[in-house]
């Protein structure tokens, strides 16, 4: 039984790691914080938008939250950076920062706003989001609580609103949204699919341990093939990845204006993987099942952001499935579902799934037989 004399166990009730053991040793915070700032381009805005800014600007942004840039890939639409803690994507009109561990992502907000100001843009949309932390007591200010995060964000965006998606004592997301989109406006057709996965298949996680850092090349290609990550990031994508020492793995991929990013924490007691993409789809189930095929998690959460003019948004408005519904995942049981509409047609859907008991039992038997 939990006691008030055991504060970490009490805090763990709100965390995302099940069965917290205070004697388990060092753990890494896999679930990421995510900040997206979208810029309204006006007549005075630099013709290249945020691409007019050099790498030194982004090094400063990343440094402000206690991370570093490790590698970069780019095309006409996206500059992609793999960080020591996750990823940064810079597009002409937006910045997406995704950071794990105990990084202080909100410390980067004034630096991001300076970047928007430097190219004479206007802030149109801001979202800050994170899955509930696995080890919330390890976080640093301003991330010690949702209240502190909200208070920090409200300093910069007074009209922004906070939301919680999912049960507070289990898998949930904190989301803050500042919306200054002038409607009616041009077509809104953005999409975002994000997945967080826990209790990864141990036959897979063994591949993400190493006695040294390994950058993009033949060795990381072999890791992708052995783990079937090459099914997610096939040859149509330009990619850069990093195998960490002693463990962990990150990959960014870009294709035109589309991106994917995957981050993996393989330790048994806190195994975790995340996946995110903005790739358009009429149904997300094929992509989600491909990712699940790599990690075979015990449980996962999926959250999708759907604009009204996107392919999937038009289907949703007609009452059709978008691929996050339970019928597409027979090995898993739907735990709960949360839906919110921020603006006309702009929908967020969040689902929690757990592997069915009979599937878990079969997997355990198969492992023993092997």
Curated annotation (Swiss-Prot):
Catalytic activity from the UniProt record: S-adenosyl-L-methionine + H(+) = S-adenosyl 3-(methylsulfanyl)propylamine + CO2
Pathway note: Amine and polyamine biosynthesis; S-adenosylmethioninamine biosynthesis; S-adenosylmethioninamine from S-adenosyl-L-methionine: step 1/1
Residues modified to Pyruvic acid (Ser): 86
Keyword hit for Ubl conjugation: no
InterPro entries: AdoMetDC-like, S-AdoMet_decarboxylase_euk, S-AdoMet_deCO2ase_core, S-AdoMet_deCO2ase_CS
Record text on cofactor binding: Binds 1 pyruvoyl group covalently per subunit.
Description of how activity is regulated: Allosterically activated by AdoMetDC prozyme. Activated by putrescine. Inhibited by spermine and methylglyoxal-bis(guanylhydrazone) (MGBG) and slightly by spermidine. Inhibited by 5'-([(Z)-4-amino-2-butenyl]methylamino)-5'-deoxyadenosine (MDL 73811).
GO biological process: spermidine biosynthetic process; spermine biosynthetic process
Enzyme Commission number, as recorded: 4.1.1.50
Description of post-translational modifications: Is synthesized initially as an inactive proenzyme. Formation of the active enzyme involves a self-maturation process in which the active site pyruvoyl group is generated from an internal serine residue via an autocatalytic post-translational modification. Two non-identical subunits are generated from the proenzyme in this reaction, and the pyruvate is formed at the N-terminus of the alpha chain, which is derived from the carboxyl end of the proenzyme.
Gene Ontology molecular function, alphabetical: adenosylmethionine decarboxylase activity
This protein's record includes keyword Lyase: yes
PANTHER family referenced in this protein's UniProt entry, alphabetically: S-ADENOSYLMETHIONINE DECARBOXYLASE (PTHR11570), S-ADENOSYLMETHIONINE DECARBOXYLASE PROENZYME (PTHR11570:SF0)
Subunit-structure text: Forms a heterodimer with catalytically inactive AdoMetDC prozyme; heterodimerization is required to activate AdoMetDC.
Name by which UniProt lists this protein: S-adenosylmethionine decarboxylase proenzyme
